[in-house]
């Protein structure tokens, strides 16, 4: 019987789902998006394990860890703050001369970044961690919500964490301000989220060791022509609607083989229409369609003007029900035609010539939180695990052709023994994160 497997890219563990997989996958993603900051026995044990291990060995970054079920082990900010106090003595700062005569303070030591609210924050911070312990990092974005949340999260864990780690949070107000901050604080790395035009201008004006850009793609879904299209449409609609209710709303892209594109599009419209669909310009709309890209900018301007019941609120307790969800926009060849929709959840349809072409498009999109691969090809798993830099991958595959166990070469057999064993194994190997 065909089933669906979820592969956790942190623990490399696989979870099998039954034929009711769309609902279970939806619940799994929802639990991550709306993760509570509650204290429980598992979280207390995890923090104690981190403290015990890091008391004996310094200079290590402990990554956030998920259980095999996909649900997060949640720890309170107070507990994490107590763990961070133990680590302060491990932080060392040394100045390094640059060729131009200036000096940069490189920071080494221990940083624990353990986001316990909302997967987009988790995804962002995971990308920040490799640079935090070695360089000053500037976070630049026109979207205040995501990066305000990161700063709030870091400040609540420990007010000194951002300073010690070298993280600088800045909203992308204008080129002059950004470059000024970089020069004043001697920033060596830049994580940028914005348009390609703005990125090109910024590259021209500043001198950084590295610039990592984000495209704004929340997650990508690949659909092959041999998929169960009806089941796929239900799952995509449920996942996207759950995701779009999060305060951190990002576009999603469905990459579908051309032969089944029209059918899948019609099925998606049918499924999303079941969720209180109405006129995109109506005050009572909760889900709407903007199928004509020519009208995208106009629709976005009206929605963001506040004339509709549109909310754009950062709220720790979850999301508001009364959020406008423009659900489906046919992708246009000219990206400028969709300008203005960057801050709204869009489900875009895009053709792919083949699975390999889909991989190429996914990799180029850059900012991924989930990738869902719908196909009956059993060989996709190995290929995608090497090709896609994402945190979770979902497969519609035949269980009989998959191996029973999948060991991560980094943690080996310890992966099945829980967070404590995983952290200790990571500490002993001294290579937690691959540097880019």
What are these regions (language model features)?
Residues 1-102, 123, 130, 274, ...:
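N-terminal Rossmann-like NAD(P)+-binding subdomain of aldehyde/semialdehyde dehydrogenases
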Residues 53, 156-161, 184-185, 195-332, ...:
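ALDH superfamily catalytic-core signature
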Residues 137, 312, 368:
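Residue-level detector of anion-binding/catalytic polar loops
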Residues 33-40, 51-65, 69, 73, ...:
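Structural signal for hydrophobic packing residues in well-ordered secondary-structure cores
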Residues 8-20, 27, 31-34, 42-48, ...:
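Conserved C-terminal structural/oligomerization subdomain of aldehyde/semialdehyde dehydrogenase
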Residues 32, 65, 135, 168, ...:
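Residue-level signal for inorganic ion chemistry
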Residues 94-231, 403, 409:
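Rossmann-like NAD(P) dinucleotide-binding subdomain of oxidoreductase/dehydrogenase enzymes
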Residues 22, 40, 175, 229-230, ...:
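Residues at or immediately preceding the N-termini of alpha-helices
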